From Swiss-Prot:
Its cofactor is dipyrromethane. One of its GO terms (molecular function) is hydroxymethylbilane synthase activity. Its EC number is 2.5.1.61. Pathway: Porphyrin-containing compound metabolism; protoporphyrin-IX biosynthesis; coproporphyrinogen-III from 5-aminolevulinate: step 2/4. This is Porphobilinogen deaminase. PROSITE patterns: PORPHOBILINOGEN_DEAM. Binds 1 dipyrromethane group covalently. The porphobilinogen subunits are added to the dipyrromethane group. It comes from Nitratidesulfovibrio vulgaris (strain DSM 19637 / Miyazaki F) (Desulfovibrio vulgaris). Transmembrane segments: none annotated. It catalyses: 4 porphobilinogen + H2O = hydroxymethylbilane + 4 NH4(+). The gene is hemC. Pfam families: Porphobil_deam, Porphobil_deamC. The keyword Transferase applies. Belongs to the HMBS family.
Amino acid sequence: MKKLVIATRGSKLALWQAEHVKSCIEGQHPGVSVELLVLKTRGDIILDVPLAKVGGKGLFVKEIEEALLDGRADLAVHSMKDVPMELPEGLVLGIIPEREEPSDTFLSVHHDSLAALPHGATVGTSSLRRQSQLLALRPDLNVVSLRGNVDTRLRKLSEGQFDAIIMATAGMKRLGLSAPRSEVLGPPAFLPAVGQGALGIEFRADRADLHELLAFMEHTPTRIRVEAERGFLAGLQGGCQVPIAGHAVMTGDGTFALEGLVADLTGARVIRRTMNGVSAPDGAQARQIGLDLAAQLVADGAGEILAEVYGSGEAVN
């Protein structure tokens, strides 16, 4: 019996994702057993500070990647929106499975929708991207930081600390969670984070055996979409905690449309553009389209907006 070890965070959602991949592997390969190695990342430990102020990239993956490099684990399962643009040398995102719904969801106890919230209502989110888009739609809202795991966020909502909260639809669906009232916030009105709803399976580049073993999970349309979105984010020198949104959809066999957005923290300035492209299954051309779209937004003024967000006077270019 061949044994594999999956490195994962210990949150309910991370464990669901790792267990899902474990189940897929063992179902496809009866001669393989899979164990989980649960690790705490910096992002899991620092819970009293808004993510945007913690600083650094890879808040939810660094410790997991170290386990891959030192041999404690064979593979890791990540939420793609948490994976930095540059991977450590020797590691690859070898497999990207089929994507779940990439949208966000509005959750409330008393209000049916974002539009139904009273003037000045308090909305909780951990994301500057959501904050910017919320304020662009509803400048009157009081948007405040909301950290913690899924259960903690829903508990704070039910206790009345917030009139509403915004969470990723995929996480809610995967864990079978809901709130008394909800509304899907999706494209084109509300763009998701780059890679939101997609999983990535990371392992060492020299593990050709894993690439072969896990190839059945690869989903080419999802890889093309995710590579396009990640190219866009890379071109803006962004991480997962900036007011940048990107969403790609397949429009044909290998063809896609990518929409990108950059906003200031108040939602007063929003720059968004769309670009069409075509890509081979590995997503290389899609990534270049993402870079090209980023350059277009920078030319339109996105660099100045991001310079203000990053706290420097030097524009991204």
